[in-house]
Amino acid sequence: YSRLISEASVKWREAKQTNDYPLFKPYLERIIAAQKSLMAHMYPGKDTYDALLEEFSEGLSVEMLDPFFANVKAKLVPVIHAVCEAGNQADDSLLHRPFPIEGQRRLSSFVMDFLGIDRDSCVIGEVEHPFTTEFNKHDVRLTTHYHEDDVLSNMFSVAHEGGHCLYELNMGDELIGSPLSGGATMTLHESQSRLFENMICRSREFIALLYPKMKEIFPEQMQGVSEEMLYRAANKSMPSLIRTEADELTYPLHIMVRYEIEK
């Protein structure tokens, strides 16, 4: 299974870069089949999806999540429709000017310093799809990606992965190497990453700190851009196809759609 995942990761990267889903499809089919077989052995007699949920977050089940998502959908979808129909969308074109990658790396460093991430225990790398991994609390590695025409994509990735990073860095030394290392559940881990990404780094208070730093790093690109314009652009809400690029309001729709597909 580990070999399959390694091979599939390479093919996924190739398929993503060339927009060639058929290249990755057979590997995805094999992964799904392997997961079904694995869950059947680990949880005999248990529904396959319930078994997978148990692996990712102990205690979750379809019986619990179906009414939860139905409630979220009933309340969230009308709000999204109202926002889209209001005709008062923020202009985020200012984020899609050419922002040199080297400057964006400086912005990443600014965000990491703002979050208080210990650089002696954490490094940042560049990948196709951002993630965070840890070997122990003294060796945590976060990653990001850079798009020259989308400066905040990287910044929010660093804020998100920085949340994961802070969770790992603040584990107790006594938990290193034990079954309790790595976080209580993936659900709790994700709550920390999205807390820093959305509640903190989209706030007016953070934008007030970010704005002068962006003017310092990108003086040409930030000409004519006010702090209010940056704040509104950072909080623009619009349905999109990419989960990791989704705004705070529409992001849950991606989770609900995936949930229905996976079931």
What are these regions (language model features)?
Residues 4-151:
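Contiguous, non-catalytic segments that form substrate-binding/exosite surfaces or channel walls
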Residues 14, 71, 101, 161-162, ...:
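A structural signal for the main folded, soluble domain(s) of proteins
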Residues 27-30, 100, 134, 138, ...:
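Secondary-structure capping and boundary motifs in well-ordered enzyme cores
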Residues 43, 146, 153-173, 190-197, ...:
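Active-site recognition of the HExxH zinc-binding catalytic motif
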Residues 88-94, 140-148, 172-180, 241-246, ...:
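Glycine- and acidic
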Residues 119-121, 174-178, 201-212:
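Acidic/polar loop patches that form or flank catalytic/metal-binding clefts of enzymes
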Residues 132-141, 165-172, 227-236:
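Active-site-adjacent bridging/hinge elements
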Residues 203-263:
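Long, amphipathic alpha-helical stalk/connector segments used for oligomerization, subunit docking
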